[in-house]
């Protein structure tokens, strides 16, 4: 598994150092450097051996400055052992002057040094050594040709390795061509084919059941003399058969998801897979399916998944340990923010207190793509915020402000922790939810009210402690009460919106002033 990436002077990456986990989601705005990070890993460990032809000179040098050497170091674990040497990283450099450039790929030991033999000669990176940490890179094009068995290191190539051994036992292939195709379709081939076809059809289900009935996805062999290197996925509809790589990118993407599902079901280990924008060409339901599939494969140690994304489905605040937020600072340098090891335990405790239902709302993940965030307690509060933005003549989308329904106060704690770890500026507004005790009630009811008030006070204190008092605005006792809406009223969001339309935001009622001030603050420039 890859553990760490260091990049210097490659394209827009002047100097970054980021940890890599079993599942790593690289998020950030367009042009921040997400794809460059993936390309850096692919240069060192991808399908093509790195050489001078791997680089564009001077375009791949930062600011086109060829005097600053490109250096990409990828660390991995477990180490590769060769004799007495333990190799834990590879370093790729491209440097030179006066048009005399050269590229070096060097192995590094635990101390970050190139090991040397007793003779003084340095250890060199060989094919076996590089294959120890090799990665499979899937770019945004989703071309099925990337996955065919003829492509070195492809997913289907790895899936079919045991099938090749099984097929070698069939010694009459050359004698009877008519029987050859049946012989090629061993039980494992059939199982792989079935899984890919069923998953792809599931991904394409939005076309309708009638369309699915006339569609088949399966294997075809382009060259019977070299069956498994020429195996390809075919798409059959009515009497028409087409190679999979001739189809639209949406169908090809669905078939790619099917290939991953086949790997998951067979329990095979892939190594490290790098995916550029896994959401590409998939509708939302298919995106959620693919995301769960990737998470399960990473959780079960079938493979390491590293991907870039613009989708709130694939950027999940509940998996905060996987997030790497890439942005440019005021000096136009790329910086990467992530949850540090020392903060993970506290955030994990908050996550465990989070309401289960709130964990499945991908809308709150939009906070990861915002320049600033207004964190509110629930859906009604979000409706109120959007209505007040409108009355203040501020477009939150145009200002890249996320209005986030956190799903309760525990959710606010979680999102605040993630925002702080990733340096996302934020403001919080929530209800106090501390109500006067009804002295006319019986003792048991009063005791229950006191316990509820105490619990809310503790929640409020935790929010203020984690967010900072200057970022927290509290409506007393609640937004509904401030607007004259009963605690048990029905259709609260609609009532909130209708009443707020009549509010003068220039001179709001005192009870509503904290909410308006929170919105005013989040619209101002804020320090990260």
From Swiss-Prot:
Highest taxon of source = Bacteria
Q: Which Gene3D superfamilies match?
A: P-loop containing nucleotide triphosphate hydrolases
As for what it does, the entry says: An exodeoxyribonuclease that degrades linear or supercoiled dsDNA from 5'-3'. Nicks and linearizes circular DNA. Activity is not stimulated by ATP or AMP-PNP, although it has DNA-stimulated ATPase activity.
**A Pfam family matched in the record:** OLD-like_TOPRIM
- Can you name the source organism? Thermus scotoductus (strain ATCC 700910 / SA-01)
Q: What is known of its domains?
A: The ATPase domain dimerizes on its own via its dimerization region, the Toprim (topoisomerase/primase) domain does not. The Toprim domain has Mn(2+)-dependent nuclease activity on linear and supercoiled dsDNA. It faces away from the dimerization domain.
Entry's Gene Ontology molecular function annotations? ATP binding; ATP hydrolysis activity; exonuclease activity; metal ion binding
- The entry's protein name is OLD nuclease
Q: Which reaction does it catalyse?
A: Exonucleolytic cleavage in the 5'- to 3'-direction to yield nucleoside 5'-phosphates
Q: What is the effect of changing residue 480 to A?
A: No change in exonuclease or nicking activity. Loss of exonuclease but not nicking. Loss of exonuclease and nicking
> Does NAD show up as a keyword for this record?
no
- Its gene name is old
UniProt-annotated stretches for the region Dimerization domain? 154-245
Q: Which cofactor does it need?
A: Mg(2+); Mn(2+); Ca(2+)
Cite the residue spans of the region called ATPase domain C-terminus. Answer: 246-369
* Chain intervals for the UniProt region annotation (Toprim domain): 370-528
What PANTHER family does the database record attribute to this sequence?
ATP/GTP PHOSPHATASE, ATP_GTP PHOSPHATASE
Q: What is its EC number?
A: 3.1.11.3
**What outcome is documented for mutating residue 283 to D in this protein?**
Nearly complete loss of ATPase
Give the similarity note: Belongs to the class 1 OLD nuclease family.
């Amino acid at each position: 598994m890859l553990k760490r990436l260091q990049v210097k002077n490659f394209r827009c990456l002047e100097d970054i150092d980021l940890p890599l986990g079993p599942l790593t989601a690289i998020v950030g705005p367009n042009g921040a450097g997400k794809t460059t990070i993936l390309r850096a890993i692919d240069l060192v460990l991808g399908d093509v051996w790195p050489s001078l032809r791997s680089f564009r000179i001077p375009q791949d040098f930062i600011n086109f400055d060829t005097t600053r050497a490109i250096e990409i170091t990828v660390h991995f674990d477990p180490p590769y052992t060769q004799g007495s040497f333990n190799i834990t990283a590879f370093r790729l450099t491209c440097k030179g002057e006066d048009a005399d450039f050269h590229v070096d790929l060097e192995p590094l030991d635990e101390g970050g040094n190139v090991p040397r033999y007793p003779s003084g000669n340095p250890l060199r990176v060989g094919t076996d050594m590089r294959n120890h940490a090799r990665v499979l890179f899937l770019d945004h094009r989703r071309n099925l040709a990337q996955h065919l068995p003829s492509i070195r290191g492809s997913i289907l190539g790895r899936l079919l390795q045991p099938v090749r051994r099984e097929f070698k036992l069939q010694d009459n292939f050359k004698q009877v061509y008519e029987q050859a195709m049946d012989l090629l379709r061993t039980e494992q081939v059939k199982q792989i084919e079935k899984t890919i076809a069923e998953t792809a059809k599931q991904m394409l289900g939005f076309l309708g059941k009638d369309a699915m009935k006339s569609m088949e996805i399966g294997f075809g062999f382009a060259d019977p003399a070299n069956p498994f290197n020429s195996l390809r996925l075919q798409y059959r509809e009515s009497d028409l058969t087409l190679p999979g790589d001739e189809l639209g990118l949406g169908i090809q993407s669905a078939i790619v998801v099917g290939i991953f599902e086949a790997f998951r079901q067979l329990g095979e280990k892939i190594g490290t897979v790098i995916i550029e924008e896994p959401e590409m060409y998939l509708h939302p339901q298919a995106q959620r399916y693919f995301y769960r599939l990737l998470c399960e494969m990473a959780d079960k140690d079938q493979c390491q998944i590293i991907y870039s994304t613009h989708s709130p489905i694939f950027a999940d605040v509940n998996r905060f340990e996987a997030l790497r937020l890439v942005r440019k600072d005021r000096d136009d340098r790329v910086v990467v923010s992530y949850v540090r090891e020392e903060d993970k335990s506290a955030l994990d405790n908050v996550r465990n207190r989070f309401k289960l239902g709130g964990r499945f709302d991908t809308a709150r993940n939009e906070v990861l793509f915002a320049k600033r965030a207004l964190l509110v307690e629930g859906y009604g509060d979000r409706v109120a915020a959007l209505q007040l933005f409108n009355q203040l003549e501020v477009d939150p989308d145009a200002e890249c402000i996320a209005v986030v329904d956190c799903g309760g106060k525990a959710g606010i704690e979680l999102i605040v922790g993630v925002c702080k770890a990733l340096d996302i500026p934020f403001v919080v507004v929530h209800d106090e939810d501390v109500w006067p005790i009804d002295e006319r009630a019986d003792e048991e009811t009063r005791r229950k009210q006191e316990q509820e008030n105490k619990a809310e006070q503790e929640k409020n204190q935790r929010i203020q402690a984690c967010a900072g008092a200057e970022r927290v605005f509290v409506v007393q006792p609640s937004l509904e009460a401030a607007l004259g809406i009963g605690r048990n009223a029905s259709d609260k969001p609609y009532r909130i919106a209708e009443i707020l339309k009549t509010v003068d935001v220039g001179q709001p009622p005192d009870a509503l002033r904290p909410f308006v001030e929170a919105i005013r603050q989040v619209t101002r420039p804020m320090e990260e």
